[in-house]
């Protein structure tokens, strides 16, 4: 997945689940997740892997 593809997956999932829940489950800071979702930042590889695993396996 690319950063943009993962961002789109997060946007879709955030319509069903609270973003704070996703942050807690993945261990990614809610502010980092928010900035990523808004396209202001790209995730570091280790955070990308955590979020990708969560969004593609659940």
Language model features: what each stretch is:
Residues 21-25:
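Short alpha-helical "recognition helix" segments of helix-turn-helix
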Residues 28-43:
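Recognition helix of helix-turn-helix/homeodomain-like DNA-binding domains
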Residues 1-16:
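A short, Lys/Arg-rich alpha-helix, primarily the initiator
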Residues 1-2, 20, 41, 45-48:
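Extended, non-core accessory segments
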Residues 11, 15, 38-41, 56:
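Alpha-solenoid HEAT/Armadillo repeat architecture
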Residues 44-58:
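DNA major-groove recognition helix of helix-turn-helix/homeodomain DNA-binding modules
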